[in-house]
Swiss-Prot record:
PANTHER family: CYTOCHROME C OXIDASE SUBUNIT 1 (PTHR10422:SF18). It holds the Pfam family COX1. Component of the cytochrome c oxidase (complex IV, CIV), a multisubunit enzyme composed of a catalytic core of 3 subunits and several supernumerary subunits. The complex exists as a monomer or a dimer and forms supercomplexes (SCs) in the inner mitochondrial membrane with ubiquinol-cytochrome c oxidoreductase (cytochrome b-c1 complex, complex III, CIII). This is Cytochrome c oxidase subunit 1. GO terms for molecular function: cytochrome-c oxidase activity; heme binding; metal ion binding. Ca(2+) binds at residues 40, 43, 45. Its cofactor is heme; Cu cation. Pathway: Energy metabolism; oxidative phosphorylation. Mg(2+) binds at residues 368-369.
Length: 528
């Protein structure tokens, strides 16, 4: 029965598919909110949204939907669940029923957040939930409380999933798949799960204290009662900075796999890649205050956080140059997945360079809360995490569905989206340099030109999204069955197994049927 299969599923592949379906819905709603923002900012003065509180609620909804309900369920929940048991050669996840509740907690979480946005004036706090804006004086209705409960449920879901992934990778590997032979995507999921496990409880503590400040008369962040509103910024960013690596590290694993497969050679410097991801995970916890240069940290503290922040460029640079070295001398196969992977490398590098600018406290005093910051984190998220997501989608979707798609259409989708997001976000660097502040629904006439270009770019991105849904529809209705490994480079490899032998063991999933059977392995594989 389909009800038992989809509502009571304990199969990692089905749960991964549910995660991917869920992220489609959230991603489309989040994209709609972003287009509303850009339409409002397309010209000076009031365009559509006369109420600034409503504008701020839309910004908050866009951020939380995209982070907690689009990127995380797709990269970690979707691809992680579907592929991880296949990559480690295990029968399923370690705790299948825990896996099920990890997904189903996201539905009430999303509903709570939707209610938070539509009850009374909505939660117009930004995703950072800073008091006093998030406190009872400024948001007197239940909206922020509902948003906090929604974040709690989402956090519990992610924590349960993280425990499951860690246990699966440590305990469920087939004979011979040592950790040093684990596929890079497996490593990425492991490091992401550890980051989730360490950072989410801090967020839970922070928003619980905010909840009691709002409703039970405590004064954790209330200056009049002896609290400190800066305290929640430290707590939030101690979670928030690892969170941005939680969003991007699974993308690193996907990009490594895709570039390796489409260059017909092993990843350059496998161990270096693994230790670079580990370093990024560890370093993510030691420079959270670079988000807080403007709150009055003393000069020694700022000097430390500048130095710590700039060190992250080393492991990130190792990864970028290893990807380039993987391409160099390979037989490049420019599939849609490879185009998105190369787009990721270029855009992520640009985002990293603007990050180097923002890491300097003296410069960040000027750039803090301007569109320069918006451009920076959208280059690493909107073109980093999302391009990685599309890259993984185009690479593995023949495996997930067992159906082929139109490669030319996939390439067209890449170019439309690439032009759209660059038109949207590159001008925002200039707006930030000119001093245009974030989270404000109006602006002086001087900023009109770049804003119009940016808003036009967002429409192009929507066209790309529509085109992608069209590709998916045609794949589901007219796609031909996939029988063999679809990404062979014909002039070099005629045989799948020859190809597998050349590429270590990061392709265990391609040894199976497409789509894999519910019980993928009849007997456990053994890695020699």
């Amino acid at each position: 029965m389909w009800k038992e299969r989809w509502f009571l599923s304990t199969n990692a592949k089905d749960i991964g598919t549910l995660y991917l379906m869920f992220r489609y819905f959230s991603g489309l709603v989040g994209t709609a909110f972003s287009v509303l923002i850009r339409l409002e900012l397309s010209a000076p003065g009031v365009q559509y949204i006369a109420d600034n509180q409503l504008y701020n609620s839309i910004i908050t909804a866009h951020a939380i939907l995209m982070i907690f309900f689009m990127v995380m369920p797709a990269l970690i929940g979707g691809f992680g669940n579907f592929l991880l048991p296949l990559l480690v050669g295990g029968p399923d996840m370690a705790f299948p029923r825990l896996n099920n509740i990890s997904f189903w907690l996201l539905i009430p979480s999303l509903l709570l957040f939707v209610f938070a946005s539509i009850i009374e004036n909505g939660a117009g706090t930004g995703w950072t939930l800073y008091p006093p804006l998030a406190s009872i004086q400024s948001h007197s209705g239940p909206s922020v409380d509902l948003a906090i409960f929604g974040l709690h449920l989402s956090g519990i879901s992610s924590l349960l999933g993280a425990m499951n992934f860690i246990t699966t990778i440590i305990n469920m590997r087939s004979p011979g798949i040592r950790l040093h032979k684990l596929a890079l995507f497996g490593w990425a999921v492991l490091i992401t799960a550890v980051l989730l496990l360490l950072s989410l409880p801090v967020l839970a503590g922070a928003i619980t204290m905010l909840l009691t400040d709002r409703n039970f008369n405590t004064s954790f962040f209330e200056l009049a009662g002896g609290g400190d509103p800066i305290f929640i910024q430290h707590l939030f960013w101690f979670f928030g900075h690892p969170e941005v690596y939680i969003l991007i590290v699974p993308g690193f694993g996907i990009i490594s796999t895709v570039i390796s497969a489409n260059s017909s050679k092993n990843v350059f410097g496998y161990l270096g890649m693994v230790y670079a991801m580990m370093s990024i995970g560890i370093l993510g916890f030691v420079f959270w205050s670079h988000h807080m240069y403007t709150v009055g940290l003393d000069v020694d503290t700022r000097a430390y956080f500048i130095a710590a922040t700039l060190i992250i460029a080393v492991p990130t640079g190792i990864k970028i140059f290893s990807w380039l070295a993987t391409c160099y001398g390979g037989s490049l196969n420019l599939t849609p997945a490879m185009l998105f992977a190369l787009g990721f490398v270029v855009m992520f590098t640009i985002g990293g360079l603007s990050g180097v600018v923002l890491a300097n406290a003296s410069l960040d005093i000027a750039f803090h809360d301007t569109y320069y910051v918006v451009a920076h984190f959208h280059y690493v998220l909107s073109m980093g995490a999302v391009f990685a997501l599309f890259s993984g989608w185009y690479f593995w979707i023949p495996k997930l569905l067992g159906l082929s798609y139109d490669l030319f259409a996939g390439k067209v989708h890449f170019w439309i989206l690439f032009v759209g997001v660059n038109l949207t976000l590159f001008p925002q660097h200039f707006l930030g340099l000119q001093g245009m502040p974030r989270r404000i629904g109006d602006y002086p006439d001087a900023f009109a030109g770049w804003n119009l270009i940016s808003s036009f770019g967002s429409i192009v991105s929507v066209v790309a999204t529509w085109y992608f849904l069209n590709i998916l529809y045609l794949q589901l209705t007219q796609g031909s069955p996939v029988s063999r490994y679809p990404w062979l480079t014909p002039q070099y490899f005629s045989d799948l197994f020859q190809h597998l032998f050349t590429r270590n063991n990061s392709s265990l999933e391609w040894c199976l049927n497409s789509p894999p059977k519910p019980h993928a392995f009849d007997c456990l594989p053994v890695q020699s």
